Amino acid sequence: MIKKIIAMCLCCISVAGCSAMPMRRDAYVLRIETYLEDKYNEDFVVSKVQRRTDGSVHAIAYPADDSNAVFDAVIPDVNKPDVSDEYIKTMMGHRYANAFSEIMHKYGYDSKFGALIWADSVMPDADKTTDLQEYADNSENAKLNTSGIVNGHIAADTLQNVAKDFYNKYHMGVSLFVYVITDSGDYHSAERLLSSYGRLTMAEAATYNPDDIFIVNCDNNRCQVRKEDGYGNTD
């Protein structure tokens, strides 16, 4: 309650323009934490706060009991009380990524995928326990649009079958970069990075010596898989 009162006072000062000095970093942290805790009834940690030249503030946040569930939180305008966040979208992304890995496991492969969902619009009243099919059906053009790793050599046809199975079960399309890593040490190092940040760039993946790179696209059960050579060229 004390935290909420302090945050409200700081917000009022900012909106009223009572101070010529920008709010300090810890004030932005408190404002975002209070917003998230009131909205989701959970404790959160906010870090990496950056004030942008356009008057917005961007931060990274995660639940206090799950440091791997990292998401973006934004104050669009420091002179207004609004805060936006990607918490539910990120949590749903983790669930879809885990569901894709579960199907991969049925085909005999260990894998790990990032948690990024792209959509024109997402189900507005979803929470982190919303049914996966329901979420996809009530979102517009939603896809699991991210990168991931597979441990062991895999054929393009197998990836295509996994993508089809995923779409048929969850009604969610995919657009994936898949890095095939056969060295177990490199695979587990990449897996730890993905677990911590929920994403893997091509430059980061290159440090783990992928044997193959595949691009997987599946929409409305029309699935294509192409092999990429790491320089933007595909087979």
Predicted regions span which residues?
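Exposed beta-strand-loop-beta-strand "reactive/processing" segments of non-cytosolic proteins
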Residues: E42-P76
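A short, surface-exposed beta-strand/turn
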Residues: A69-G93
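Positively charged n-region of N-terminal signal peptides that target proteins for export
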Residues: M1-I5
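C-terminal motif of bacterial Sec signal peptides marking the signal peptidase cleavage site
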Residues: A16-G17
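Short, non-transmembrane alpha-helical segments in secretory-pathway proteins
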Residues: M21-S47, Y96-G108
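Metal-dependent nuclease catalytic core centered on acidic motifs
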Residues: D85-G198, T207-R226, G230-D235
